[in-house]
Amino acid sequence: MYRHFCERKNFNPHEPIHSVDELPPVAVSVFKELGFNLNSVPREELTLALQSSATSGIPSTVVIDKITAKRQGKAMVKVVSEFIGKERKPFLIMDIDPRSASRKLLGARFAAVTGYLKFASKVGYFLKADENGLSYFDVEGIQAFIKELPSGQPVVVFGFTYILYQHVLKSILESDVRLHLPEGSKIIHIGGWKKLESEKISKELFNEQLARCFGICPEDVIDIYGFTEQMGLNYPDCACGCKHASSYVKVLARDTVTRSVLPAGKEGMLEFITPIPHSYPGNVVLTDDIGILEDSPCPYGRPGQRFRIVGRLKKAEVRGCGDILSSKLVFQQKERTEIKSDSHLDIQYFRGTLKGNTGEERLQGIISCLNDKLDWLRQQPVEALIGIIGEVAKKWLSDERFSFLKDKGLLFLSNWCEASHLRQIAEEGLRGNMRYCDTFLHFPNSSKHFLKANSRGLACHWMAGNVQILGVFALVQCIITKNVNLLKVSAKDDGVFRALLSAFEGVTYTTEDGYTLEGSALMDTVAVVYFSRDAKKMGELMSGSAQVRIAWGGKEAVETVAKYPSMIDCETVVFGPKLSYAVIAREELSSEHAAKKLARRVSVDVSVFDQSGCASPHNLYIEKGGIVTPERFCEILAEAFPKTEAQIPKPFISPEQISAVHSSRGVYDFKGRVWGSDTMSWTVLYSEDNELCKPVYSRVLMVHPVDHI
């Protein structure tokens, strides 16, 4: 697999290099997905597989042989002994005893704990588990252990950062116990600070409190940075405030967007280059950690390249319909603290007269006004409704006020709302004659039976905040079918619906029969409001008044609507969490010409809403056996995307999203093929596996060949 990666990067490891900058880095995401298969030696030479503790949910995996293990051990001893001394010392380990019945609770921490035992003359474990499997700090046990030690014998307290804080430090602070370690004792902790982000405790306060509880100086509390992908290489804190790279390591900082090497003093993603790994391609690893290289010498005379960790690259925001696959479709029930009901109503668009003082009274007044307009709306010809929507769609495209929505699906919406297209939809939905919406007409192929399509009445919409444009598709169809509409928008709406609806004001449309419809009058049948999810009574009022309920959003959002009381004959339409994928049958790939037309359609589907909407696929399954192979179709697709981008411009991409695209490309550099723009505006990823992959967003399409659909 690494050979394939090098070929993809046009790198020949057998040719001389002029700088380590030329070595293509492997992103940590590769070890999360492919770690077990990334062996550089025959599998029979592997002795074990190491996994990270997976603070991000998916553990990294590296496979180890005897040579790698020996190198790791030597590197670790050299670095750590400089900070705690070369002589073995008693180790007070703040974790589960791997020999105990509770060893399963130790999990992936086992490898890290046992790795430090080579520095120990005596070991005690002081994290215990009760009968329910809950961990607690054994205060009495550690006191007894310290009491038995020779007088003045320095010790080393070792543990993971979050365990030291959650189980040890908190337990001591909540009690009257104070421990007094002998002079020269150290506290070393590993694992990083990610699990403590919610605690909002600074490193300085952590060191100070921990030192006070154990009776040592804060300078003797040492945070050791390291990562599974290069196990054995440790970077302890120096008194200067930096970490030092040993003689085994070269550190680079790369720009989060361009991946170019940065000079000292510039903040970037840290890359570590080392000869230590022998059994897997972990010699050049690009981490998700953000840091700064320092080019000045250490004031304490310590050798080695200096760097500081300033944080971790944030994950790209999940923006899909209902947060697609955000938890692999496993939703955990979360208890919500009971909050006092909110009665505030924000009326964002309503052309009627407001009545009432409280939020509930005003909402009831809006509902009554909308229902009063229902008879008028039912008298409007469907041709007039379609015509005026078509005119407004042109305005959405031409008016600069709506330019901020063009890269969020407005172009697609405007084309979809063309009068000819809406007539086609109405004809198909109304048995071939859209005038069934207007009056009783003969049933098809019958002179005795008549048919008329009646509107339901009040349609209430609960809109999502991530892809507002999608909600307009449902609204337009509700208007054409002569329903009055009440929209409850998201707190993230930022006035999008108010702006879109205001475009109707001042527009008129006259049918061929001479009937004129004013957009302002039509907008008297629509209202837009916002109230919080804690405004339970208003949610129940809106739901109980609806003949149609349309809910958009994630599981929690749509479940909230579903739990509201409703009329017995109310129709509920849910656009909740969805998996978005596309399928191409072999018959559709009968020629290069057919494939090019299809590739254009696929690229448009991916680009509309920038994959934030459920209409945009993230995975594409292509049936084998066509004239055009799945891999060739990817090549054609790569030719189509730039043309589509010219039509549907790519919106701003955050550094976090660009990093996510880089990571996904890095994985496929190992296991498949990658096509994509240099600006990360689109990406096609191809591999032989056919599993449904987690969305990356930002026009990243994962293509899978399959034998049969």
Model-inferred region functions:
Residues N12, V62, E82, K86, ...:
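Generic macromolecular interface patches on structured domains
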Residues H4, N10, E22-P25, V30, ...:
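Residue-level preference for alpha-helix termini and adjacent loops
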Residues R8-P13, V20-L23, Q332-R456:
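N-terminal Rossmann-like NAD(P)+-binding subdomain of aldehyde/semialdehyde dehydrogenases
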Residues H18-I222, F227-Q230, N234-G241, S246, ...:
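Active-site phosphate/ATP/adenylate-binding loop shared across adenylate-forming ligases
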Residues Y2-H4, K104, Y116-R378, E383, ...:
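Active-site glycine/GP-rich loop and adjacent strand/helix microenvironment
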